[in-house]
Amino acid sequence: MTGHKPQSTEETPQMANPLDFVTPTEFVELPSKGRYPTGHPLCGQDTIEIRYMTAKDEDVLTNRSLLKKGLAIERLLTNLIKKNSIDASSLYIGDRNAILIYARASAYGNIYKTKVTCPGCTEVSKHGFDLNEHNVYHGDDIEDTGITTNGGITFTTTLPLSTIEAEIRPLIGTDEISMSKKNKNIKNMTSLVTDQMRYFVVSFNGYTDKKTINLVIDNMTAMDSKHLRNTFKVISPDLQIKDNFECPACGHEEEMTVPFGADFFW
């Protein structure tokens, strides 16, 4: 009787697939320097790891359904962020802008050529922006401004005319998405200033209910409104690309800021 030959317990070595590779990543510095509430995945983190853009990401940017809904950039950000625990919509707008700039530069180069409408004569011309020449603001330059910080998450200022104490915060992705959807449904764009305030105001004299906040905003003097908007800029971390634009048609010169939308990548 022939004995049964035992099978080897060693696995047959697998040949490496030459097409197996990991999408490269890079670390992007956060303008906010991780000034997020306790418990947020980026709280105290100076950087965020993102993936390089792929052909699938390009599909997202050309998806008509997503573009129509204004969700193309949101889907792209979600795909780029490596850690699934980080919700792109919870990031400060300045941090989101930083991710978009680095992703675009690594995918298509640092020179971004786009159409610019001259503020002087409305002539449309091409202008190139260098994405490496960006301005980073951490949103923490509040010394001698009369602004007080509440743990770096919200900030308080006193309106000069009404003396109302206003508590405000930087905007996040959720706010940006909501404002974008609302603006698409509004033909009259004259309320953009007050609409933005409704998002970044946390309270007036300690009152946090929307009814009180809307009442104060709708009746706010121009002086108080300007002060509140300027304070909002001071406390908001951001990364912007600005360049001096000279119109080839009329010679008008002005500093222009690059807008961030789906067409930023084309």
Question: Which residue stretches match the model-derived regions?
Answer:
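Long C-terminal interaction/binding lobes of large macromolecular proteins
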Residues: 1-266
